[in-house]
Design a protein with these regions (language model features):
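Hydrophobic packing positions in regular secondary-structure scaffolds
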Residues: 2-255
Length: 255
């Protein structure tokens, strides 16, 4: 379960204007799903989301119900939470499953939190077992905890591995996140002991041990930490990411 990274080749200089909204509204009225799909596919997801947010509620509902129009997961996660919730009410369970299967776990949890309870079990039961169990575990924690914020897609490497072993593993393993800037280093108990930027791995000799190139982990986020405490931690220590650990200090995710 991972959001495919396609945005790098999308236009980021889209000029938003009311005239384009009028065109999109007209295409919705004419059931021209192909035009909208093609237009959105050429834009950065944030721009497509901006257009959807500027439509009237009735036009958004009509857009979602158009035949042959499926909202791109990359666009969906760019929408503000209130619009996401509104759109979810107009989507079938199958459509929600299709979106969730292509999202990182933290985004999937955010969506499931807004799904009516009676539909949640149907959606979860339609997901692959591995994804379903991971999401159920996150949902078992209180809403305002780190567990609901964390991403379960991360890259972890044993501290006794060499740089060469690590590079070979990263090349061969198909289940890793498609993009990552930081690698977590773990001991034999899967406790995080450090981090290494992926760029440093690529520039270090193959026989170098990962333990010698890592920066030791200073701050770990308990899985049940309140999300306000997490936010303060990131702000106070200027963090870009942090390891999330369970009660046994095992690495279970990242924020």
């Amino acid at each position: 379960m991972s959001l495919t990274k396609k945005t790098k080749d999308k236009k980021v200089n889209f000029e938003f204007n009311k005239e384009y909204i009028r065109i999109v509204t007209s295409k919705i009225a004419n059931n021209d799903a192909q035009f909208i799909t093609n237009s959105f596919s050429e834009m950065h997801p944030a721009d497509a989301a901006d257009i959807i947010e500027h439509l009237s509620q009735n036009d958004r509902e009509s857009l979602i119900k158009l035949n042959n129009f499926n909202i791109d997961p990359e666009v969906f996660v760019e929408l503000n939470e209130s619009i996401q919730t509104e759109i979810i009410t107009n989507l079938s369970s199958d459509s929600i499953v299709s979106i969730i299967k292509n999202l990182d776990s933290d985004d999937a949890i955010s969506i499931l939190e807004n799904v009516p309870e009676e539909d949640k079990n149907n959606i979860l039961s339609s997901l692959p077992p591995k994804d379903r169990f991971a999401l159920l575990e996150s949902l078992s924690y209180p809403e305002d905890t780190a567990a609901r914020l964390m991403q379960r897609e991360f890259t972890a490497i044993p501290s006794n591995w060499s740089v060469g072993q690590t590079i070979d593993y990263l090349r061969e393993n198909k289940d890793l996140p498609e993009e990552f800037l930081e690698i977590f280093i773990v001991n034999e108990d899967f406790n995080p002991v450090g981090t290494v930027p992926s760029s440093k791995v690529l520039t270090s000799p193959r026989d170098t041990k990962m333990a010698t190139v890592m920066s030791e982990s200073q701050l770990l986020v308990p899985v049940d930490m309140d999300r306000e405490e997490v936010a303060n931690l990131f702000e106070n220590y200027n963090l870009n990411s942090a390891a999330v650990v369970d009660k046994n200090n095992k690495l279970v995710g990242m924020i």
